Amino acid sequence: VCRDWFKETACRHAKSLGNCRTSQKYRANCAKTCELC
């Protein structure tokens, strides 16, 4: 679980879309975030 609620939400949202890498809105945090979640 991510410490940052926003990042955790972004991670879950990106995973739910099935494509973390191309999620432009969360692109900056997505790679690191998804590894933590």
From Swiss-Prot:
<keyword id="KW-0964">Secreted</keyword>
<feature type="disulfide bond">
    <location>
        <begin position="2"/>
        <end position="37"/>
    </location>
</feature>
<feature type="site" description="Important for binding Kv1.3">
    <location>
        <position position="17"/>
    </location>
</feature>
<feature type="domain" description="ShKT">
    <location>
        <begin position="2"/>
        <end position="37"/>
    </location>
</feature>
<feature type="site" description="Important for binding Kv1.2">
    <location>
        <position position="12"/>
    </location>
</feature>
<keyword id="KW-0528">Neurotoxin</keyword>
<feature type="site" description="Important for binding Kv1.3">
    <location>
        <position position="27"/>
    </location>
</feature>
<keyword id="KW-0632">Potassium channel impairing toxin</keyword>
<comment type="similarity">
    <text>Belongs to the sea anemone type 1 potassium channel toxin family. Type 1b subfamily.</text>
</comment>
<feature type="site" description="Key residue for binding Kv1.1, Kv1.2 and Kv1.3">
    <location>
        <position position="23"/>
    </location>
</feature>
<feature type="disulfide bond">
    <location>
        <begin position="11"/>
        <end position="30"/>
    </location>
</feature>
<dbReference type="GO" id="GO:0042151">
    <property type="term" value="C:nematocyst"/>
</dbReference>
<dbReference type="InterPro" id="IPR003582">
    <property type="entry name" value="ShKT_dom"/>
</dbReference>
<dbReference type="GO" id="GO:0015459">
    <property type="term" value="F:potassium channel regulator activity"/>
</dbReference>
<feature type="site" description="Important for binding Kv1.2 and Kv1.3">
    <location>
        <position position="13"/>
    </location>
</feature>
<feature type="region of interest" description="Crucial for binding to potassium channels">
    <location>
        <begin position="25"/>
        <end position="26"/>
    </location>
</feature>
<feature type="site" description="Important for binding Kv1.1, Kv1.2 and key residue for binding Kv1.3">
    <location>
        <position position="26"/>
    </location>
</feature>
<protein>
    <recommendedName>
        <fullName>Kappa-actitoxin-Bgr1a</fullName>
    </recommendedName>
</protein>
<feature type="site" description="Important for binding Kv1.3">
    <location>
        <position position="22"/>
    </location>
</feature>
<feature type="site" description="Important for binding Kv1.1 and key residue for binding Kv1.3">
    <location>
        <position position="24"/>
    </location>
</feature>
<dbReference type="GO" id="GO:0005576">
    <property type="term" value="C:extracellular region"/>
</dbReference>
<feature type="disulfide bond">
    <location>
        <begin position="20"/>
        <end position="34"/>
    </location>
</feature>
<keyword id="KW-0166">Nematocyst</keyword>
<feature type="site" description="Key residue for binding Kv1.2 and Kv1.3">
    <location>
        <position position="6"/>
    </location>
</feature>
<feature type="site" description="Key residue for binding Kv1.1, Kv1.2 and Kv1.3">
    <location>
        <position position="25"/>
    </location>
</feature>
<keyword id="KW-1220">Voltage-gated potassium channel impairing toxin</keyword>
<dbReference type="Pfam" id="PF01549">
    <property type="entry name" value="ShK"/>
</dbReference>
<keyword id="KW-1015">Disulfide bond</keyword>
<feature type="site" description="Key residue for binding Kv1.1 and Kv1.3">
    <location>
        <position position="19"/>
    </location>
</feature>
<keyword id="KW-0872">Ion channel impairing toxin</keyword>
<feature type="site" description="Key residue for binding Kv1.3">
    <location>
        <position position="7"/>
    </location>
</feature>
<comment type="function">
    <text>Inhibits voltage-dependent potassium channels of the Kv1 family (Kv1.1/KCNA1 (Kd=6 nM), Kv1.2/KCNA2 (Kd=15 nM), Kv1.3/KCNA3 (Kd=10-39 nM), Kv1.6/KCNA6, and KCa3.1/KCNN4 (Kd=172 nM)).</text>
</comment>
<keyword id="KW-0800">Toxin</keyword>
<dbReference type="GO" id="GO:0090729">
    <property type="term" value="F:toxin activity"/>
</dbReference>
